[in-house]
Structures are given as C-alpha cells and as structure tokens.
C-alpha cells in the first residue's frame, strides 16, 4: 500500500476506522484526549484540541468506549506524529491536532483486550 505522497507504507498492520464514542487519553498529559480516528494492532491516531506548547511525547495511552464499560489502561506508546489539522468550522480557540502513536511491547492481557476492541469497536 502506498501513502499519498508516493512513498511506501511502513505499517505492518492495516488501520481500521473506529466507531463513534471511542476515546484515547494520553498519559501523563491527560489534556490530550479525543475521538480515536483509526487503530490497528500496531498503533492508533486520535484527534484532540490543543496547542504546540501542550504537545509532549506520551509514554502511555488509555482507550475507552463511552457506549459501555470498555477500558484499556496503560498501553505503552511512542509518539510518531503530532500535527495541527485544518478545522475551518471549529468554535474552539485551541487548534485541532492529530496524534499518531505506535504501541510498544504489550503484555498478553493488553493484547487480548486490544483484539477485543478491534473486533467490537471498529468498522470492517
């Protein structure tokens, strides 16, 4: 699969679109929270309101669904990209940003819960 700019895609896992109501929270900077845009076994991307000053590398991310009691805690991550995205209709004074993260080494329990999330909360 190729990226838009023509360079080869580097992801090992296909990103899946996530259903509404699935939220990611970056840890330790819990000011970065928002709707998950897409996710795979290798990482995720979510959008949040924030400024460049807030943009710090996260160490962990937590995933939850506001539709039910799903909560996946303390997934180790590495920030891949944190960019401002164009949002012409926003009423917020803060810019909209997208944070892309790669998962670190997950334990067995985290892998099981992530697989459950991928099955239940994504569009196939």
Over which residues does each language-model region extend?
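N-terminal helix initiation/capping motif
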Residues: 1-52, 115-124
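C-terminal output/interaction extensions
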Residues: 2, 89-124
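A generic structural micro-feature
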Residues: 14, 53-55, 69-71, 91-96
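Short conserved beta-strand and strand-loop elements enriched in small hydrophobics
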Residues: 21-26, 55-72
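Short beta-strand/turn micro-motifs at beta-sheet edges
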Residues: 33, 87-90
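Short beta-strand-centered aromatic/proline hotspots
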Residues: 33-36, 73-83
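Short, conserved beta-turn/loop elements at beta-strand boundaries and strand-helix junctions
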Residues: 41-42, 81-88
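Hydrophobic residues positioned within well-ordered beta-strands of beta-sheet architectures
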Residues: 59-61, 75-77, 99
């Amino acid at each position: 699969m190729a990226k838009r700019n023509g360079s080869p895609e580097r992801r090992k896992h296909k990103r899946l679109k996530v259903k509404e109501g699935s939220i990611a929270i970056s840890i330790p900077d819990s000011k970065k929270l928002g709707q998950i845009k897409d996710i795979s076994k290798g990482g995720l991307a979510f959008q949040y309101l924030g400024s460049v000053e807030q943009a710090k590398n996260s160490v962990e991310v937590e995933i939850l669904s506001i539709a039910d009691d799903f909560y996946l805690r303390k997934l180790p991550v590495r920030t891949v990209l944190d960019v401002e995205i164009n949002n012409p209709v926003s009423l917020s004074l803060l810019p909209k940003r997208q944070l892309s993260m790669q998962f670190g080494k997950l334990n067995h329990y985290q892998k099981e819960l992530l697989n459950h999330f991928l099955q239940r909360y994504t569009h196939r």
